[in-house]
Structures are given as C-alpha cells and as structure tokens.
Amino acid sequence: MNKEELKPMDLGGILDKTFRITFSNMKKYIKVFLMYFGVIFGITLLILAIVIGFFIAMGFSFESFSEPEILTPFLLTIIPLSIIAIIIIIFIAIIFTGMIYDIFIKSFIGEEWDFKSSFKYVKSKFWTIFLAGILCFFIIIGGYLMCCIGILPMIALISLVLPVIIYEKENATGSISRSFKLVSYSFWKVLGSVILFIIIVQTLSIVFQIGFQFLPFMLQSLDSGKNIQMIIFISIFTIVTYILYLAYSILASALYGAFYVLIFFNQKIKHENFGVEFLADSITVDQPLDDKTK
C-alpha cells in the first residue's frame, strides 16, 4: 500500500480520488457489469420468447386470452418463471454490488483483484448483504416517516454498510452499527459529502434524461411529423442520447461504490489510525537504508 493512500483526505480529495479510482478500475467493473447484464438480458429474452410463443399459438389474437385452455397454461408458465426470474435478479444484483465494492477496496489497499475469487467471496456474503439491505430499507423508511428530510441523514449513516461487510466481515446487524459508528465520528462532514456527491451525480443524470426524453418530444411537437429529415434527426438523436445515458448510468453506479469505499477508509484513517501497522513495517524496512546513508 502506498503511504500517500494513508493520508486523510478532505472532500475535494475524496471527489478527485473517486473519479481516478473509478476510471483506473473501469475494465474490471465492465467485466462484472457484463456478467450482470448478461444474466438480466438472458432472462428477459427467455420470458419474451415464451410470451411470443403463446401469441403465435393464439394467432396473435388478444381475445384468445379469455379462453381457459390458453390463459391457464400461460399463467401456470409465466408466474413461476417470473418468480424464479425475480429471485435470480435479486441474487445477481447483490453479487454485482458486492463485487463492485470489492474491486475498489482491493484497489485502495493495493491488493490484486480476481473475478473468480471475488465472486466466491461475495457469494459467501450473500445473506449478510441481503439481510443488511432489508434492515437498511426499514431504517430509511423510518427516516422518511419521522421527516422527509430524515432520509438523507439515514442514508449517510448506513452508507458504509457494504464496505464494512466486504472488508471487516461483519454480519448484517453488526455492519449497520459499525457504519453508524464510523459515520458518527464526523457525521456532518460525511452527511455534507454524501449530499454533495448525490447532487453532482443526479444533476448529470437529469441532463441526460432531459436530452433523452424531453428534447426529442419537443422537436417532434414543433415539426408535427411532416419533415422526414427531422424525423431521422430525432431518431438518431434519441438513440445517441439513450446510449450516453445508459453509459452514464453504468458509470454512476461505479462512482457511488468508489465514493463510499473512500469515505469508509478515510474515516478509519482519520479516527482509528488505520494503516499504522503498515507504516511501522515500512519504516522498519527502510531503516537499514537510512543507516547506510549516514
């Protein structure tokens, strides 16, 4: 681990390092994302193929759905399949999220990241992450019920749950209490950092959403569909904007992971002397070199 990594960071340093550590690990992140996207895409195609198959069997007639011999087999097929698909999606989403955090944790502490070992490790933490996610959901709901403004403080307090689970190997309840403790060392600074980061990420997201949803609609309303060149332009513009929005959404999830990992380690460095053993070892190793230079 580089000694520079163990220096406490201010908000500017955290934001700067968030982008640097995200882009430096983008290849690893894309590899994990492709696994996640591949599973989701495969499930979607399977369900779509079944629905199309039933439509072909019915002669593309919606009225046939009212017939028991068509409706019953359709429901008996699609409902269990949908339940299985939801379970698989939840599983793969948890694995995907955990592996993202593992990538950035390994990057920060200077350890090599391996896809297979990361997948196995995060899979072993599946139920911990799942239960912690449910508990965090109720905590956020509690913040909403107390006051809408209470959502952001609750998000800040539980923001370090995943880094705690992945790095410190705490259980579901222990990870939440540990996250509360780490954030409470400097609650207002962490809360301000989280709010600012959310504003930055969501502002860029809104810009892409405006480009993808509203601008083509406005242009189409002005043109009234009479100009073929305008229709082509709107179609190309919509596709390009959608691709950019999708790419940014992928980037945003990586940025969130990197940001919370850096907040986690920064709190440990500032308030718990994280890395003292490493610095002591490095000083011991460097000492003979210093003696030779005297």
Label each residue range with its predicted role.
Residues 74-75, 79, 111, 126, ...:
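Membrane-helix interface segments
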Residues 32-55, 77-97, 130-155, 193-220, ...:
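Hydrophobic alpha-helical transmembrane segments in multi-pass membrane proteins
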Residues 95-124:
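Hydrophobic transmembrane alpha-helix segments characteristic of membrane transport
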